[in-house]
Amino acid sequence: LDPKVVQSLL
């Protein structure tokens, strides 16, 4: 997964 997607989930 892209870092941006991960941050969005957090």
Swiss-Prot record:
Transmembrane intervals: none
Main location: secreted
Keyword Transferase: no
Subcellular location(s) per record: Secreted; Target cell membrane
Keyword annotations: Amidation, Membrane, Secreted, Target cell membrane, Target membrane
Positions of modified residues (Leucine amide): L10
Domain of life: Eukaryota
Entry comment describing in which tissues the protein is expressed: Expressed by the venom gland.
Signal peptide stretch: none
GO cellular component: extracellular region; membrane; other organism cell membrane
Miscellaneous information on this protein: Negative results: has no activity against fungi (B.cinerea and C.albicans) and bacteria (E.coli and S.aureus). Has no hemolytic activity against human erythrocytes. Does not show cytolytic activity against insect cell lines. Does not induce feeding disorder in lepidopteran larvae after peptide injection in the vicinity of the head and thorax.
Family statement drawn from the similarity comment of this UniProt entry: Belongs to the MCD family.
This protein's name: Venom peptide 4
Source organism per UniProt: Orancistrocerus drewseni (Solitary wasp)
